[in-house]
Amino acid sequence: MLLIESFYEGVRAATDQLELDFGYRTKSRLRAKLASGDEVGLFLPRGTILRGGQKLQARDGRVVEVVAAPEDLLEVRCADPLELARAAYHLGNRHVAVELGDGWLRIQADHVLEGMLIGLGAEVLPLRAPFEPEAGAYAHGHQHPGDGSGARIHMMGGQ
């Protein structure tokens, strides 16, 4: 089994891919299969959240790219920004992982939350797409200098 214990920060292209949904990308210890079919064991620092496009360094020198797998999501749209902010508030109040976009929110599919959002007047559409939610104010994710993931107001914790 291929072992991965660190991130790759160089310029070499990845030689394989590791496709994982968001739930698996939050696990620091994981056994999975690469696109090539090779088994891989992840032993990353606790609290790591993998993002699509990140590169990992295997013990044997191989570079593996993380791919955010498509999953069942709900896209939330509202008639105006205040209603969208209200929907985001209620999701945040329930500690729901939320991906933010221009005029929309995305969450993992959940019929209870879907009902709540419809009750708030939101338009809720099911879709299948990669899920890249906000890290949260207290997250301790891994970032790369120069990749556009530098500290921002919504990434205040321990960067």
Swiss-Prot record:
The keyword Cytoplasm appears for this protein: yes
Entry superkingdom: Bacteria
Main location as per UniProt: cytoplasm
Keyword DNA-binding: no
Subcellular localization: Cytoplasm
GO molecular function: nickel cation binding; unfolded protein binding
One Pfam family per UniProt: UreE_C
Cystine crosslinks: none
Keywords: Chaperone, Cytoplasm, Nickel, Nickel insertion
One Gene Ontology cellular component annotation held by this UniProt entry: cytoplasm
CDD domains for the chain: UreE (cd00571)
GO biological process, one term: protein-containing complex assembly
InterPro entries: UreE, UreE_C_dom, UreE_N, UreE_N_sf
Family: Belongs to the UreE family.
NCBIfam families in the record: PRK13261.1-1 (NF009751)
Function: Involved in urease metallocenter assembly. Binds nickel. Probably functions as a nickel donor during metallocenter assembly.
Record-linked HAMAP family: UreE
Stated name of the protein: Urease accessory protein UreE
